[in-house]
A protein has these predicted regions:
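Boundary of Sec targeting at the N-terminus
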Residues: 21-25
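Positively charged n-region of N-terminal signal peptides that target proteins for export
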Residues: 1-4
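Bacterial N-terminal signal peptides
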Residues: 8-18
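Primary mode marks residue(s) on the alpha4-beta5-alpha5 output face of response regulator receiver
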Residues: 27-132, 137-251
Length: 251
């Protein structure tokens, strides 16, 4: 009897494993990786708002002594990075790789050095950002900004230590519903997409009903810095839907 019980238990485990593998195989590898490494909830202690369905942004914090000086120092470092890596080929040689470029003129492409991006989860070196932002122009790729990152569960205090919340805008990509590998491209990308980073599906219930892969948080917190643009810290002028109480607005 004990042997039969053990055999039944073993078969049950095997079936469960096989089912998990089969389900995983329904989705592209990159979505499976996002699911594995992504966050399990989009809740955060950081005072934040939703912009559209898939982006969560920090609220402007109360100015603190030294914020302006810190921000200026970051801009100086970012400007030096852009000058050094003005030639995108040099960035590539130093380990920066383009993240899903479309080839569309005017697009902004993140060139990410994954070793440096991992290091940013522990400490920040403003002269070695995890990502450099290039804009595609008729003259080639133009270095226009840098991106610094923090863990997806970072607190407001941690974000503020890296770039002052009274000046910088931090964001996370949230509420992602991955589609099956057989999904037509227009279902995952473009204005009519249901799945993916810009899809109309943005709740767990709707994602499950559509047999999608629900990923509450994709990647961690990130902030873009454009040292030579009028809006160097980009984002404060974006239209957002609040997901936090009004009492948090001045925190």
């Amino acid at each position: 009897m004990k042997k039969l019980h053990a055999l039944a238990l073993l078969l049950g485990c095997c079936c469960a494993t096989a089912l998990a593998v089969a389900l995983a195989q329904d989705f592209p590898l990159w979505e499976q990786l996002l699911s594995h490494y992504g966050g399990k909830t989009d809740e955060t202690s950081v005072p934040s708002m939703k912009m559209g369905n898939h982006m969560q942004t920090s609220l402007q914090g109360k100015p603190q002594p030294g914020d302006d000086e810190r921000a200026q120092a970051i801009l100086v470092a970012a400007r030096e990075v852009l000058a050094h890596y003005a030639d995108v080929n040099l960035a590539v040689r130093y380990g920066y790789k383009p993240f899903h470029p479309s080839g569309r003129m005017g697009e902004e492409v993140h060139y990410t050095n994954y070793r440096l991006a991992r290091r940013e989860q522990e400490e920040i070196d403003y002269t070695q950002p995890g990502s450099i932002l290039y804009r595609r122009t008729l003259a080639g790729m133009k270095a226009v900004g840098v991106m610094y990152t923090a863990p997806r569960d970072a607190t407001a205090e941690r974000l503020n230590q890296i770039a002052p919340l009274s000046i910088a805008t931090w964001h996370r990509h949230v509420d992602f519903c991955g589609g099956p590998r057989t999904l037509p491209r227009n279902e995952q990308f473009g204005p009519g997409a249901r799945f993916g980073p810009q899809g109309s599906i943005h709740t767990e219930d709707d994602c499950r009903a559509a047999h999608g892969l629900w990923i509450p948080v994709v990647f961690g917190w990130m902030t873009h810095v454009y040292p030579d643009d009028e809006n160097a810290w980009g984002g404060m002028d974006m239209q957002m839907e609040s997901n936090t109480g009004a009492a948090n607005l001045q925190k």
